Amino acid sequence: MPRDPSIKKVLLIGSGPIQIGQAAEFDFSGSQACRALREEGVSVVLVNSNPATIQTDPDMADVTYVEPLQADIIAKIIKKEKPDGILSGMGGQTGLNLTAELAEMGALEGVKILGTPLKAIYEGEDREKFRDLMNRIGEPVPRSVIVSSLDQLEHAASVVGFPAIIRPAYTLGGAGGGIAYNLDELRRIVELGLGKSRIHQVLIEESVAGWKEIEFEVMRDANDTCITICGMENVDPMGVHTGESVVVAPILTLRDDEFHLLRNAALKIIRALDVQGGCNIQFAFKGDDEYRVIEVNPRVSRSSALASKATGYPIARVASKIAIGLRLDEILNTVTGKTPASFEPSIDYVVVKVPRWPFDKFKTADRTLTTAMKSTGEVMAIGRCVEEAFLKALRSLDTDVEHHTVLSELKMILSRPTDERFGALFDALRQGMTLNEIAEITRITPFWLEKIQNIVEMEKALTAHPDDATILKAKEFGFSDLEIAQYSGKDVSEVESKVGLPVYKMVDTCAAEFPAQTPYFYSTYGDKVCEVTHSDRKKVMILGSGPIRIGQGIEFDYCTVHAVTALREDGYEVHVVNNNPETVSTDFDTSDRLFFEPMTLEDVSHILQKDDYYGVMVQFGGQNAVNLAVPLKNEIDRLNLKTRILGTTPDAMDMAEDRDRFSVLLDSLSIPTPPNGSAYSEQEAYATAERIGYPVLVRPSYVLGGRAMEIVHDDTELATYMREAVRVSKSHPVLIDRFLQNAIELDVDAVCDGTDVIIGGIMEHIETAGVHSGDSACVIPPQSLSPEILADVRDYTRKIALGLGVVGLVNIQFAVQGSTVYVLEANPRASRTVPFVAKSVGIPLAKIAARVMMGERLADMPYKEIEVSHVAVKEVLLPFNKLPGVDTVLGPEMKSTGEVMGIDYDFGRAYYKASIAAHNRLPKSGNVFISVTDDLKDQILQVAKTFTENGLSIYATSGTVEFFAERGITANLVRKIAEGSPNVLDMLRAGEISLIINNFADKQSRHDHQQIMRVAVDYGTPYITTLQAAVAAAEAINSVREENLTIEPLQHYIGR
């Protein structure tokens, strides 16, 4: 049947900021949905708060609202836009929760809920309704009890027993859940889970930890045609969230009858839910036909992004078309260009997904993996065998693996699921543990352990007898040339000459049964036939950014996609190399050719040798891609390839990173920089710090996201840093700068063609120097800087860009102290603020940069710096609610996972929007707790006065109450933590505090601060830790009480 003609306009809800449990997969699915709906003549209204996404580009939807994802705000958009339907399943858990809220408040009268019906949302997300539905259709679920209060826990424990699994209703990435082994743990987890749940409901169920975890991605249309897209198997057994597990496709350890038993159950469940579109169903499987249905995601999910990339089947595109009435057999599979979407995909290769965890950033975090997610991103690898896919995935992670050789230590690591366990499996086998021993400790299916044992045996074979046959077999297993050289004792070039280049095979949805129109490729040594074809068009390779991690997020995928789009519009053939299954850049039709490969020198150079490339672009893929620039140039020269690094030269990139060279450049341009130096040893560091004067900012060179960056105040702290935080070498010194206290920091993003410079935007940070720029809120245009200061910033930006020889993007960070503008650093590459600037001012910086890198001149383009009449604020999302044990104090090392944008016509309202979009809802009524250091009390006075004038009550400890009283402000007394209860922690737990403003000066106040922040995070109370943010919050609260928020589309602000 044709699409529903009554659906002319659809509201699509995005997923908001990148956070643990909800990453870039929803930008990929939402962007695909926008294109699919518009192909059918449907007008799309998009609402999403995340400026770093492709879907919030002004050209992606017909109307784009970059607004907080709050039901009351979306209700106003619905009233204004009058959509015929709402599509919630592309916005992850956020989209489903908001749709349910909107329906409950009556905002969806006359608006059709598309794809996932309201009944399916309730039955999929409400744990009690889901259990009842499964019982009705005869599908087994774990024994369980639903609780909505702590009084019910003893009864629940008596029914379920221990260990018990806790699953809150309507939460993201298992948030608020976990595994309890006794009543005290059960009480602690359930108390948090009830607070996280939208309906204050938690399921406590019997543990099936140790069973196999199997997932099916299924699709259904209005005609009741159902297909399975992909079956996936978790290497980790039940007890670890699927987002935290190593996952393999296709399912390899079930017999055919077992596979069809679960497949049939999955189809039965999607029919019972009446979902029209995609659905993810998770099973626990014990064997002997015994299984349990664990949960259903009646929407596009992280697993569906993986299934889509693993098979080539465009799940979000097909689900969007089904949502407006099309049948599966009426939708064309755009990968083959011939088959209908009703054909089930088949694959003739092995896909492995491995999560990327942030524990390299958070040393104190609890690394235990449970039913609540902690990873920030993931990589995907494809091979002809499990061993090859495993090793390519591990190579893609780009993490340092700590090896263990002590058996007692290994057994302890294996006994508890952590991020270290998968790597420890290899070490355990190297140390002689048997498969049975390891299987007994870990409950991992022996099949997977056998594959790892094959890899370990190959390591031994390479060492013992590295003949040609052994080396070739190692390549089939996925070993890199460098690894083979290390094990065999041979030179890398000798290995290269023996094994040659890999072949490249297609991912085409149909196991090569039909020719593919838009294929993507993976390398293998397990086949002889190469499926890459050649064209005569001018080809450019663009390196993507790999897995999402703190410091390198979706912003770089945005830049990659914009560069691809610009070059394809100009007629170039564009090839992308990336390994992240969540992203738009790895969508089947983003580039002319996609290589799903590790982002290493060897893997990239292999691709370059397979075709004639005009050039390679590294500056859009973040620090990892930029770090490849110099070695890749050397490799191109060594192999005598007819290609080049496009844009800014590797030497210019090195000049910006090399502190000594960069300082010489700034001196020659008469541009001020804080006193600084480089240290190649501990003694040099002491001497440099003494010359500069404490406090100093110390950091390693060539890193992203401020990794291992600290402010140190004396020799003792510096000694600790040099011995514990960094490894200094002759090629990687420690950089030491005078720390500019109370300075205002600025970021500038610009494009340079070697002759001219266009400034995209000047961003003023809300927080002062000392907080990493990636963790600071920032605003366009600057709010507190004089025209003279801004003129200096513009002048220095042009001089530095031209002095470095930038061709493409450049980001420069400044600090303003008094009337002096200091340059902190310059990064001649894409930055994490490029998407925010582009959305704020309407200039497509990444597209302009890509064209400049191909030789176009800025003078021939219709762009210039724009003065905007509105205000845009970028705020960050911090992961503390997902990572117990993490220090919540902000500093020079980046901790945020994502960002949001608030846009309005004054700073207060824009900041208010950004705050609530970042889940830090500023109160219009209630109690504010203020506890700041003595040096800030005079400055916090006006903040407190503004709060009281707006009807908020102030709570503080004795010293602050007295200080306020002497100055005419009434504050209520609350005990210090050390003075016992009732104190601020008790008030937070009781829900009596609406906002926390707290900083610290010494070890005791820092300890108190950490306790307050941890309870505030656990109970969802907004908190502020800097004076500047408190001032901004007061202005925001005052502004929204005086005037309503402006709800207008992005196109309205930027004149589209």
UniProtKB/Swiss-Prot annotation:
Q: Which residues bind Mn(2+) 3?
A: 813, 825
Summarize where Mg(2+) 3 binds, as residue positions. 813, 825
What residue spans carry the region label Carboxyphosphate synthetic domain? 1-398
Q: For this protein, what is the EC number?
A: 6.3.4.16, 6.3.5.5
Record-listed Mn(2+) 4 binding positions: 825, 827
Q: Where is this region: Oligomerization domain?
A: 399-532
Q: Name one GO molecular function term.
A: metal ion binding
Provide the catalytic activity annotation.
hydrogencarbonate + L-glutamine + 2 ATP + H2O = carbamoyl phosphate + L-glutamate + 2 ADP + phosphate + 2 H(+)
The UniProt entry, under PROSITE patterns, shows: ATP_GRASP (PS50975), CPSASE_1 (PS00866), CPSASE_2 (PS00867), MGS (PS51855)
Q: Which pathway does it operate in?
A: Amino-acid biosynthesis; L-arginine biosynthesis; carbamoyl phosphate from bicarbonate: step 1/1; Pyrimidine metabolism; UMP biosynthesis via de novo pathway; (S)-dihydroorotate from bicarbonate: step 1/3
Q: Binding of Mn(2+) 2: at which residues?
A: 295, 297
Q: Which family does it belong to?
A: Belongs to the CarB family.
Q: Any idea what job this protein has? A: Large subunit of the glutamine-dependent carbamoyl phosphate synthetase (CPSase). CPSase catalyzes the formation of carbamoyl phosphate from the ammonia moiety of glutamine, carbonate, and phosphate donated by ATP, constituting the first step of 2 biosynthetic pathways, one leading to arginine and/or urea and the other to pyrimidine nucleotides.
Protein name (record): Carbamoyl phosphate synthase large chain
Gene name per UniProt: carB
